[in-house]
Amino acid sequence: MGDKARARRAMKKAGVPVLPGSEGTLDSEEQALKIAQDIGYPVIIKATAGGGGRGMRVVRNPSEMSRAYRTASREAEAAFGVPDVYVEKYLENPRHIEFQILGDHAGHVVHLGERECSIQRRH
């Protein structure tokens, strides 16, 4: 699930709670502004590909949207080869914990532990 917008849709379909935001990739700055108005600020523009905090920009008010949208999209394309971005509600000071689980076709499953990712390079 390297495409985060597609992963969001899959999680919603599976009943997993997700932050309010766009249903997929954004088509325009205007669409980002409309969604931000609907869900409230602050929001974050995020690259659909990649990770490590690249292609992400926090937007605290409408006057910041145009620059944030363009910068996130350009950075995403430069870093990952894909300019697509989406928007979601921004959480101040969240914790990012990942759990790694592997399974095979025979039903064998192994839990590799958890990882505290809140100290990643950005956001």
Segments the model singles out, each with a brief description of its role:
Residues M1-H123:
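N-terminal beta-alpha lobe that positions the nucleotide/phosphoryl donor
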